[in-house]
Amino acid sequence: HDGYVEVAALREQNIAQTYLSYMEKEGIFRKVAKGLYLKRDHHEDPYYVLHYRYKKLVFSLQTSAFLQGLLPEQKEISGYLPLNYLTQGISGVASRHVGQKEFTLGLSLAVTPRGNLVPCYDVERTLLDALRYPEKWEKEAIAALFKSAYPKADKALLQTYAKAFHCEGELALAVRLLG
């Protein structure tokens, strides 16, 4: 995990947490979240730390597009949470609570710039979310996303998602204008 050590992983290997506490005191590791430490000479991965702290967070919208390699990194991190989970949301994340169907459709994994695996939505779902929530995107970002992602998207899967989210018309219009 690129310099990360999880306390739970140490416990599984019957290694006492006191060793990690000692190494933290010596400056070898630093605590970045409850139960998660990072080696001194490694840079923090904000996506991995957020995923570690909030296991049910799924990166969405522009953050998903970035993690999928479709857009440059954005200042704001966005993610979806299931209903009734952390009802206050997450500090520093533009989070939105969604129902089970919306939460699970298009779930995928992506590798962060630091090499860690985190949950996000697949390319097809990210394209549809740009159409469903255009107010969350800059117009240029939607156009850039469609130009880079639509040619390689699975068109049948895109249609399946559009039908599930009742946005076939928006997709057809976007394909005519941007695709």
Region spans (language model):
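Short, amphipathic alpha-helical "recognition" segments used to contact nucleic acids or chromatin
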Residues: 1
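Nucleic-acid-binding surface
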Residues: 4-9, 24, 32, 36-179
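Short amphipathic alpha-helical interaction segments
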Residues: 12-25
